[in-house]
């Protein structure tokens, strides 16, 4: 039995030393120290020994078990340390490499178009006027010659908050508020009103329940239709190119009389007819007209002394036409791949 223990110890220590991974080491633990291992078998044979041999062989067996346990524990620590070092080596971050830079936003295409128009009108002596987006029914409709139950209200399905308040459907209420408080001793009214508006439209490629408008208003003495036409001509040439021609078509808006819609000669085909202009050679841009006398009177302005014109257009439509954007939803999805295409846009050609 003595020789058996010595052979077992030598063989086990050699295999433990050569173990290359934790699984192999655990298998050796089970092989030599497990319930079915040789050490267990040796301990069972102790009962066959004489009374003199039992203490000696029992002590030796315990020494072998302790030595093997110590060898396995030591080897386990070595293998665990090596495994940790390998993992750290594999997961090491090279801090000298450049990091992944976060995506940086740019000035939105709509913002650029709005600012371009604002700069143009400011250069013509206009001021920028703003008003609440949650508006009174009176300013959104009644002050603009749209009394309650007027059939023209059906043209603008609205988001009502209470019976008398709603999300504005146009920036025209800003014009009504401006006219109410204006002092003509300081000169005529010349304002543009940019801002968000809301209508109950189903979102699709050309419609959105929220969009932006820029409306213009000029009121003073001796303001004529010729002034309106000249202003719209400057707008068309500034935004779409000096070679643009304009066409005014009779239309109807409750707050202007007479009312016209402005078309520009197609910047894509030069008026020959193409997909953009639907073969007509003209593209509809905005609505406009001379301020209705009723609107002036409701704002406390003497319509026999003062006259004016107003116009309104959507920056989204301008942006889509000018930069060939085929879906209005692209302007609102915050996709940097889209917005970064326009970080260097300039006035003029597409």
Curated annotation (Swiss-Prot):
EC number: 6.1.1.20
Catalysed reaction, written as an equation: tRNA(Phe) + L-phenylalanine + ATP = L-phenylalanyl-tRNA(Phe) + AMP + diphosphate + H(+)
Molecular functions per Gene Ontology: ATP binding; catalytic activity, acting on a protein; magnesium ion binding; phenylalanine-tRNA ligase activity; transferase activity; tRNA binding
Keyword Signal: no
Cofactor(s) of this protein: Mg(2+)
Protein source organism: Listeria welshimeri serovar 6b (strain ATCC 35897 / DSM 20650 / CCUG 15529 / CIP 8149 / NCTC 11857 / SLCC 5334 / V8)
Protein name (record): Phenylalanine--tRNA ligase alpha subunit
Subcellular location: Cytoplasm
